[in-house]
């Protein structure tokens, strides 16, 4: 079961209502925000297909997920997600073990919201900019839609 990272690339202007609702449900409410979801969630594939023209997504690796959690993970109060907080509140040894359990499917990141973890990540625009158009699909030489493991390079550029 892959763990998908979904990043909103396009902004909020002229978004059709059905796409806006789906982006809201995915917790992608502004540009350059990211969320992570398991493939096992019912309806996720259909939701990703619906918002394909506004987002990019792919399978995230464990090492990239750990770095994303370390640099951009937040808890309530806009405080950083730290190893100490994970040990005290989740009973895990640190962010490395949290990333491992998320990738394996034992934990779901969006369900950690009950414990005080924010279910999204605020990212920077990519360093060096996008190399191609944000109006075309990745398979057609653009930046949108499914990009497989190439999502890891984009996330590292946006941290």
Swiss-Prot record:
Record-level GO cellular component terms: cytosolic large ribosomal subunit
Gene that this sequence comes from: rpl30
GO biological process annotation, one example: maturation of LSU-rRNA from tricistronic rRNA transcript (SSU-rRNA, 5.8S rRNA, LSU-rRNA)
Subunit structure: Part of the 50S ribosomal subunit.
Alphabetical keyword list: Ribonucleoprotein, Ribosomal protein
One Pfam family in the UniProt entry: Ribosomal_L30
Family of the protein in this entry: Belongs to the universal ribosomal protein uL30 family.
CDD domains per UniProt: Ribosomal_L7_archeal_euk
Protein name, UniProt field: Large ribosomal subunit protein uL30
Species the sequence originates in: Aeropyrum pernix (strain ATCC 700893 / DSM 11879 / JCM 9820 / NBRC 100138 / K1)
InterPro entries assigned to the protein according to its UniProt record, in alphabetical order: Ribo_uL30_ferredoxin-like_sf (IPR036919), Ribosomal_uL30 (IPR039699), Ribosomal_uL30_arc (IPR005997), Ribosomal_uL30_euk_arc (IPR035808), Ribosomal_uL30_ferredoxin-like (IPR016082)
Signal peptide bounds: none
Annotated PANTHER family: 60S RIBOSOMAL PROTEIN L7 (PTHR11524), LARGE RIBOSOMAL SUBUNIT PROTEIN UL30 (PTHR11524:SF16)
Single GO term (MF): RNA binding
């Amino acid at each position: 079961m892959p763990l998908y990272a979904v990043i909103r690339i396009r902004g909020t202007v002229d978004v059709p209502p059905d796409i806006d609702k789906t982006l809201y449900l995915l917790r992608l409410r502004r540009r350059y925000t990211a969320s992570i979801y398991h493939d096992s969630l019912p309806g996720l594939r259909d939701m990703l297909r619906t918002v394909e023209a506004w987002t990019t997504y792919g399978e995230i690796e464990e090492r990239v997920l750990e770095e994303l959690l370390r640099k951009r993970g937040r808890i309530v109060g806009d405080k950083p997600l730290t190893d100490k907080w994970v040990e005290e509140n989740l009973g895990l040894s640190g962010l490395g073990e949290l990333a491992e359990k998320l990738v394996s499917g034992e934990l779901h990141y969006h369900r950690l919201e009950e414990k005080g973890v924010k279910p999204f990540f605020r990212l920077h625009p990519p360093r060096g900019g996008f190399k191609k158009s944000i109006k075309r699909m990745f398979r057609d030489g653009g930046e949108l839609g499914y990009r497989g493991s190439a999502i890891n390079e984009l996330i590292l550029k946006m941290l």
